[in-house]
Amino acid sequence: MDILEETAAPLKDFAKNSIRLFKKCTKPDAQEFQKIALATLIGFAIMGFIGFFVKLIHIPINNILVGGV
């Protein structure tokens, strides 16, 4: 029985903590959702532009190094 309790105790603690976290969480209101969506959109745009410019710079460098076969 002692082994069973030792293996079940962490599972019980995890379940208890998960339920507590789930009850504490709330859905964002419309304004908060818009802020999060805008921040995500700006992040995606910045990362896209960085990737585009890195690619734009590396294509000519790669052609010079390879020799334009």
UniProtKB/Swiss-Prot annotation:
GO terms for molecular function: protein transmembrane transporter activity. InterPro entries: Prot_translocase_SecE_dom_sf, Translocase_Sec61-g, Translocase_SecE/Sec61-g. It holds the Pfam family SecE. It is a single-pass membrane protein. One of its GO terms (biological process) is post-translational protein targeting to membrane, translocation. Keywords: Endoplasmic reticulum, Membrane, Protein transport, Translocation, Transmembrane, Transmembrane helix, Transport. The chain crosses the membrane at residues 41-61. It is found in: Endoplasmic reticulum membrane. Residues 62-69 are extracellular. Residues 1-40 are cytoplasmic. One of its GO terms (cellular component) is Ssh1 translocon complex. NCBIfam families: secE_euk_arch. Heterotrimeric complex composed of SEC61-alpha, SEC61-beta and SEC61-gamma. Necessary for protein translocation in the endoplasmic reticulum. Belongs to the SecE/SEC61-gamma family. HAMAP family: SecE. This is Protein transport protein Sec61 subunit gamma.
